[in-house]
Amino acid sequence: MDQAELSIEQVLKRDIPWETYMNTKLVSAKGLQLLRRYDKKPESARAQLLDEDGPAYVHLFVSILRDIFKEETVEYVLALIYEMLSANPTRARLFHDESLANEDTYEPFLRLLWKGNWFIQEKSCKILAWIISARPKAGNAVIGNGIDDVLKGLVEWLCAQLKQPSHPTRGVPIAISCLSSLLKEPVVRSSFVQADGVKLLVPLISPASTQQSIQLLYETCLCIWLLSYYEPAIEYLATSRTMQRLTEVVKHSTKEKVVRVVILTFRNLLPKGTFGAQMVDLGLPHIIHSLKTQAWSDEDLLDALNQLEEGLKDKIKKLSSFDKYKQEVLLGHLDWNPMHKETNFWRENVTCFEENDFQILRVLLTILDTSSDPRSLAVACFDISQFIQYHAAGRVIVADLKAKERVMKLINHENAEVTKNAILCIQRLLLGAKYASFLQA
């Protein structure tokens, strides 16, 4: 049978030769006694044994996973642990019992993530997540006990699953499910962002219809919400298509828990950086108004919708035209919005282009190098030509930034709109501002 399709029930039907393991000193006499009392017994009997002697069973199971490498036995012990924890997740505290203080209870599971078949990987991942979440807390702090390396190792495996899943249909969902519970941990957030994990979430944010895909979408959005509390992750969210995708989800989703987690994410991000401008540009005020007319039962969602609506109204009042323009450029998707051709916009805002060492001008030039969207290329060429016309040192600045070579490449572009604006840009660059009105004609 394909190991990926193995069930817990099938694995637990096996008869494991524990006596043989004792004879070869891989299981102690006491361990064998514990196993005989526990193995193949009814759930009520096993529950009583765990209540009476839980840490001893944890020690036994972890020891077997550390010392025995036979696949069938490893699967069997993982199934026993998984069954024990899924029946009562609070039993994960047993792994942190004082009697096990000198034992690395994480190591076998972390190792098996990379060594085993899919059944072994999946069960090891879920068990690790339970054990990590059950860590004892000292005051407001969680007791460490070498946990940082464990978390980093687990994050590495989770990111690997998102990039190249070990199982075609279950690899990604198990990774997202795990992350949605672990991203509460500061070390996990940090490791995940450092591993460039945030970009792996973005493609998963899209409207869903089936029960499985809705759950995956919900847990992905939950990950984004947890990351919205972490500044380095926020920087990535601001420059990716995350906001557009979340907006599409909230427009088309009828699942209350999905809508709630997206709205709570928006509420978190609204006061930060350029998110407010993005939300306005994406038409979120209208979407929020529409959502408020629906019959939601969740009070938190209703409160969040009201707060977001008020926050967006306030943001619209404060948003300058250059803020909106800057946001559009930073997202890399340009369109012929009115401001691009408004004389007043360029006269009033051309000096704003000097901010951050001409950041916006540099981004426009980067769009020329990297974008495959004809509309974005055409608008970028036009805007650079506008900067040349309206800034006193426009020609010199643009020439210093090596714009000529980049624009010249677009003169023979297959799209007529791109060609026209590339030629205009080159003419202004070569001939100067006093010919601008003549050239525009």
UniProtKB/Swiss-Prot annotation:
It is a peripheral membrane protein. It is found in: Vacuole membrane. Disulfide bonds: none annotated. It comes from the Eukaryota. GO terms for molecular function: proton-transporting ATPase activity, rotational mechanism. Keywords: Acetylation, Hydrogen ion transport, Ion transport, Membrane, Transport, Vacuole. It holds the Pfam family V-ATPase_H_N. One of its GO terms (cellular component) is cytosol. The modification N-acetylmethionine is found at M1. V-ATPase is a heteromultimeric enzyme composed of a peripheral catalytic V1 complex (components A to H) attached to an integral membrane V0 proton pore complex (components: a, c, c'', d and e). Subunit of the peripheral V1 complex of vacuolar ATPase. Subunit H activates the ATPase activity of the enzyme and couples ATPase activity to proton flow. Vacuolar ATPase is responsible for acidifying a variety of intracellular compartments in eukaryotic cells, thus providing most of the energy required for transport processes in the vacuolar system. Belongs to the V-ATPase H subunit family. This is V-type proton ATPase subunit H.
